[in-house]
């Protein structure tokens, strides 16, 4: 069975989305990134939070809008929600809880990664002991407010081990393993 990975681009002050979930800031940091390009080929399924699924898209208004990794990845997607849409969405399975979502995504991913998208879903995976790796692409910008990479008020320390550190002109990539 593959591993569970949370990947996100984050501002230097710790935000993955701006105020109100705004993702437009991300556009200028989406240049070529060999670390992400390599990762995309190793993703077998996505586990997506409902707010991420229904939220802002850095590719809004383009042909890449609504496509994971700007159209760079296709495959099974599992969205955590208590309110699935009435009309089915092709390629997307809506699940009502984390355990069933993780089980379905892991089965679909096989030996590849289940890539988690969404801060709240990543936090839930971490708290459940299901998160294995974290890839943070750190952008050289300060957003000042928004959605944090991890929001864990009153949470305990979680030890991480640095697996790799790479960079592009746009971002610095930090790949971490959750130490158990």
Please describe what each predicted stretch is:
Residues 1-180:
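Enzymes that bind and transform nitrogen-containing heteroaromatic metabolites
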């Amino acid at each position: 069975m593959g591993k569970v990975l949370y990947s996100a681009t984050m501002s230097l002050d710790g935000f993955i989305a701006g105020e109100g979930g705004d993702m437009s800031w991300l556009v200028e940091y989406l240049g070529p990134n060999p670390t992400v390009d390599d990762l995309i080929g190793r993703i077998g399924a996505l586990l997506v939070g409902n707010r991420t699924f229904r939220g802002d898209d850095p590719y809004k208004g383009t042909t890449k809008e609504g496509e994971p990794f700007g159209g760079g990845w296709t495959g099974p997607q599992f969205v955590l929600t208590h309110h699935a849409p009435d009309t089915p969405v092709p390629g997307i399975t809506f699940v009502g809880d984390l355990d069933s979502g993780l089980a379905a995504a892991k089965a679909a991913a096989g030996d590849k990664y289940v890539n988690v998208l969404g801060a709240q879903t990543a936090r839930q995976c971490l708290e459940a002991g299901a998160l294995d790796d974290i890839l943070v692409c750190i952008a050289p910008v300060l957003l000042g407010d928004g959605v944090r990479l991890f929001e864990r008020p009153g949470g305990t320390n979680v030890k991480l081990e640095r697996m790799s550190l790479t960079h592009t002109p746009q971002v610095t990539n930090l790949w971490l393993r959750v130490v158990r």
